[in-house]
Amino acid sequence: MAALILRTLLDNNVFSSSDYIHTIKDPLSTSMVEVSGNPQSCGVSEAFSSPSLKKADVSLTFGSSQEISYAAMSAPLNADTSRIPDEIAPTDVNKTELDLSTNNFGVPLADVVLPSSSSTTLSPSIVSEQQQQQQQQQQQQQQAISSEEIITSKGGIKSGAGELPFSIVYGSAFSKTPEIVSFQQPTQKQINDFLQMKSDATRVVTSDGYIFREIFNPDHDDGFKQALEMYGSSFFEPTEPGKNHLHTLCNRGLYRMMVMEDDKGLVLACAFIVEVHAYKSYHMDYLAVRPGIRGGGLGGKFFKQLTTHLRNEQKYLIITFESEPKLVPWYLRMSCLHLNVVSDQVTYENGETFFWWLLVVPLGKIIDDGSDADTDSDSEHPTSAPSTTAPNYALPLSLTEKQRNRSYILYNESGVSYEFNQQTINEIAQYLLTFMSDAKK
């Protein structure tokens, strides 16, 4: 009967689309109820379907905390069930959803309010006291189900005595990174196992046998501990955050963390990335290579794999980062664009001034003067970058007026385009100075 009511809701456009499929386990049988629809329109907290029930009790949650229970008598399939009470008109979604795509749950787990035995409200005028007691027992049994075994592979879930308290979905057609939808508060072990699965999903073995992956669980990933030590050997206080401070910033969700390892799990290079939503870009705040192997080309291989990983997300179109003057020629060889934008500068007591530059890597193709030139980091000779000849970086880079005012139209395979020039990158630089200064406090 629950399936009948839910189908009726679909027929009346309570769910506006069918791109979302949700499966709920019947606590009285092995049958499953599939709820199709748009999660932005309606959230279903419980639905029961069993031959032993005379009624189908469906609890619908709308708005912030309003919960409405709707019980309908069994009816033939051809019965007129198109009339739904006006008070069940959906207004907003209120389902507990933990988005782990960036290691930022959105809300602290301790603050998540999850369904309990008291969350299903039944009308006394319709449902007998015996049915209320029976339903409470069913919910208690369902919550007592043990699920010690967790996800065992990228594509499936293995449970112990029953269903897991959450299901795995994939967020978009472009992303293979899984997300988690929770109906009960998961244990810390389940969260750790899931985040490890997410990291494994990003794992890529390069042609040289190195392993590139993204870290989602800083406190329980040995790769992060190694990356933190590598950061400490490359960036120093007081101009940069200390290791403990950086660790705190990662736990806050400020950074995405990428590493490259050998086959024994030794981290050889790492990067800390910030997503700049306002400008459709990523900002690479820190990149480090393990001391002792610098200068051997490993940094370039890591940078290439990093930009490939970000480009495949088809989420943002450019990656920006600051660079010390002496490193600018290396970044230009990596197909970076130098648009003469100073991201920061410092003047020492002796009067000497050093500049930091905001360089750009297009994560897509550039349309320039009617041409379609790919500007990936694997391009041997970038068509849009200035000469790699090292100029005098004690002063701003001298470019022609055409280069200074040059605009770039960038697009990726998803069809999204973005136009930027020196002025746009200068706006990003000013934004980052303010944003990162506040975020690192």
Curated annotation (Swiss-Prot):
Gene3D superfamilies per record: 3.40.630.30
GO MF annotation, one: acyltransferase activity, transferring groups other than amino-acyl groups
Alphabetical list of Pfam families matching this protein: Acetyltransf_1
Superkingdom, taxonomy of origin: Eukaryota
Biased composition range(s): Polar residues: 382-391
Region (Disordered): 121-146, 371-392
Chain intervals with Low complexity compositional bias: 121-143
InterPro entries recorded: Acyl_CoA_acyltransferase, GNAT_dom
Annotated protein name in UniProt: Uncharacterized protein DDB_G0283377
